Regions:
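Short acidic/proline- and small/hydrophobic-mixed sequence motifs that coincide with surface turns
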Residues: 112-116, 130-131, 217
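Low-complexity, acidic Ser/Thr/Pro/Gly-rich terminal tails and inter-domain linkers that flank the onset
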Residues: 33-101, 230, 236-252
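Short acidic/polar inter-strand loop motif in beta-rich domains
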Residues: 210-219
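Asparagine-centered strand-capping/turn motif at beta-strand->loop junctions
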Residues: 105-111, 125
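Bacterial N-terminal signal peptides
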Residues: 16-26
Length: 254
């Protein structure tokens, strides 16, 4: 009997949490907002979370973050620059494991193969980049950087990471990056400043993307650059309107 009562109480807590989440979103009063399904495990408390992806987006950008999911459910992400929010997305209800359940979808808009992709996670709960509140972030790197990019500007070579698997992201294809694969490293960085369970927001930015042949695109500057002949580690910027392919073939934002 005691077990039945305990199970009943747990069931009521889960139902109440789901109802509260839907009511909260329903009362938000913002046109276009939609209720995101609750992502919570039994016995874990729900909380309001937010996720943003970087702006601006130009028609010459090599890649675009096309989708974010939490627990397999797509969320309405806001827009941000670094750790600063530009326009809010739809808040959603999830448990303390929410960041582990995030997946980032990145699409290659160019006509070249991407061999290394980097995205940066910033945590506004820790700092927004203002005076006295520096940002804290973690860079997720997928694939292997080209040989040319493994040199510092003084000519010394970085130690390659043999644990990284090769990446070959073809034109028009989308890469799914599960944050769960990097959650232990992310947690270690975050907990130097704040208990991990207190993270409620994440801003996701495009970093460096490397192509076959050594060309690079930087999400922070939106510039392409190519290796300088005879100077390992050095790159030459291309024109601001350079794009490898047809910029209208793949949309800049879905």
């Amino acid at each position: 009997m005691a077990n039945i009562r305990q199970q009943s109480k747990q069931h009521m807590k889960v139902v109440a949490g789901m109802f509260a989440a839907l009511v909260w979103i329903g009362l938000s009063g913002r046109p276009g907002w939609r209720a995101v399904p609750v992502a919570a495990a039994t016995g874990k408390s729900l909380g309001t979370k937010l996720a943003n992806v970087d702006e601006p987006i130009t028609r010459f950008d090599a890649v675009v973050i096309t989708k974010l999911t939490v627990g397999g459910q797509q969320i309405d992400a806001g827009r941000s620059t670094g750790a600063r929010e530009i326009s809010p997305g739809t808040p959603f209800q999830a448990d303390e494991d929410w960041l582990k359940n995030v997946s980032i979808f990145v699409t290659n808009r160019t006509n070249k193969v991407i061999v290394c992709a980097e995205v940066e996670l910033l945590f506004p709960d820790i700092g927004d980049g203002s005076v006295g509140r520096p940002t804290t972030g973690y860079t997720i790197s997928v694939g292997q950087r080209p040989e040319w990019s493994l040199y510092y500007r003084d000519g010394t070579k970085m130690l390659p990471d043999a644990t990284r698997k090769p990446l070959s992201l073809a034109p028009g294809k989308t890469l799914e990056i599960p944050v769960a694969d990097y959650i232990n490293q992310i947690q270690s960085v975050v907990e130097e400043k704040l208990p991990f369970l207190q993270i409620t927001r994440v801003n996701i930015s495009r970093g460096s993307f490397y192509f076959e042949g050594g060309m690079r695109w930087e999400g922070s500057s939106h510039y392409y650059s190519v290796p300088e002949t005879g100077h390992p580690g050095y790159y030459t910027k291309l024109a601001s309107n350079y794009f490898p392919g047809d910029p209208g073939q793949y949309r800049a934002r879905e």
